[in-house]
Curated annotation (Swiss-Prot):
UniProt cross-references to NCBIfam families, sorted A to Z: miaB-methiolase, MiaB/RimO family radical SAM methylthiotransferase
Stated name of the protein: tRNA-2-methylthio-N(6)-dimethylallyladenosine synthase
Keywords: 4Fe-4S, Cytoplasm, Iron, Iron-sulfur, Metal-binding, S-adenosyl-L-methionine, Transferase, tRNA processing
Cofactor: [4Fe-4S] cluster
Transferase is among the record's keywords: yes
One Gene Ontology molecular-function label: metal ion binding
Amino acid sequence: MSKKLYIKTYGCQMNVYDSVKMQDLLYPFGYESTENIKEADVIILNTCHIREKAAEKIYSELGRIKKLQDTRKKHGLSSAIIVVAGCVAQAEGEEIFTRTPYVDIVVGPQSYYNLPELISKVVRHEKHLIDLDFVEEAKFDQLPEQLYPQGASAFISVQEGCDKFCTFCVVPYTRGVEFSRNVEQVYREALKVVSNGAREIMLLGQNVNAYHGKGVDDKIFSLADLIRYLAQIPNLERLRYTTSHPIDMTDDLIKLHSIESKLMPFVHLPVQSGSNKILKAMNRKHDREYYFNIINRLREARPDIVLSSDFIVGFPGETDEDFEDTLDLVRKIKYGQCYSFKYSPRPGTPGATRTDQIPEHIKSERLTILQKELSSQQLAFNESCVGSTMKVLFDRSGKFDGQIIGKTPYMQSVYINNTNQDLLCKIIDVKITKATSNSLTGEIYT
C-alpha cells in the first residue's frame, strides 16, 4: 500500500522546483503525492524567508497541522511525519523544535536530498532531526532524475545562492554563496523533461546570469553558452531564465536575444529602486544609469523584448525624492509586468539594523502609488496585443469546463474556450480578443 506525501510550497520558482525534486526523491520509497493533507503520512512545508513575518506564517500553519494531528489521534490514527524544509528551516534551525516540538525534521534547501534517510529514522522513532549543511555539490549530485512530469513548461535549477549581499536580502544567508551546476547534469535533466512532454524550460537561479558551470574538459560555460547548448535539444521550443542581476547581464547574453529564436523575448531584471542613493544603500553595485544602459541594449538586440522587474518601496532612508526617482524610472522604461513590495526588515541583514526605518503608513502609500502605475503599464501592454495573433503554449486546463490556459512568449496568461485537450503541450496561433491587466482572452486562429 502506497504512503501519501503532502507538500505545501511557499515563495519562489526555485522552491517549486525543489518541491518537485522532493516528490521524485520520495517516490521510490513508496510515497505518492496527494493534495489532501488529511490523508498524508508525510507533511512537508517548503518555506520561503524573503517577506516579513515569514517565520510566523509557518508557525501558524504548523499550529493548524497540530490540530489535525490531534484529531487523527482521537480517531486512533497514526500521526503524520512533519517536515519543515526550505529557507525558514535554514534561518530558524533548532528554534523550530523549541516552538513546535511536534515537528520531526528540519532540513535546509541545500540538504533535502537526505530526506529519505531522515524520514526513515523518524519511522524508527528518532526525533528532532536537523540537517542544515551547505554543500551545493552534494545536493545536485544526489538529486534524482525527474519522475513527475512537470507539463508543458518545466523548471530546471542551474544556479543557487548569491554573492551580492544586498543589504535587504537573506538569500546569501539561507541559500549560501553562488554555485553553478555541471553543464552535462543540466543537459541530461533538460533531455528528461523534454522527453516527458515539456516544450519550454525555465532556467532558475537566485542570480541565474552569474552561471559559470563546468562542461566537458572543465570548460566554463556562461549562461549564454548553456542556452546555446540546450537550444540544440529536439522538440524543445522555448527557453527562459530567471532571476537576473543587472551587473551580470553580459554582452554575450544580450546579443543572444537577437540570434537565438528559442530564447523568449522576455527578461525579468530586478532593479529594486530608481534612486542612486537607495541603490547604493542597498549595495546593488550599479546605478540607475547603468540599468538604463542595459535596458537600451536589450531593446536594440531584440526590439520586441518585454521587461519585468522587482521594486522595494520604503527602504530605510528613502525620501519622497528617492521615491519619485523610482516612479521616473518606471515611467521611462515602461514594463510589461512587475512585482512590488514594501520593505520588510529581515533579521541578520544590514538593512534591519538601520535607525532610519520608514513608517508603515508611508510605505503603504508609496506602494499604492507605484502599483497603480505598474498596473496601468501592464494593462496598456496587454491591450496593445488585442487584435494580434500570438503563439501560445497551452499548459493547463482552466477552472471552467472547456477552458484552457497558455502563455505567450511574453509570459502573459491566455484563456480560450476549447474542449480539445489535445492542445495541451502544444504551441498554437491564437487571436487575442480581450485584455485585462492580468490576462488575455483569445480564440484559435484559423
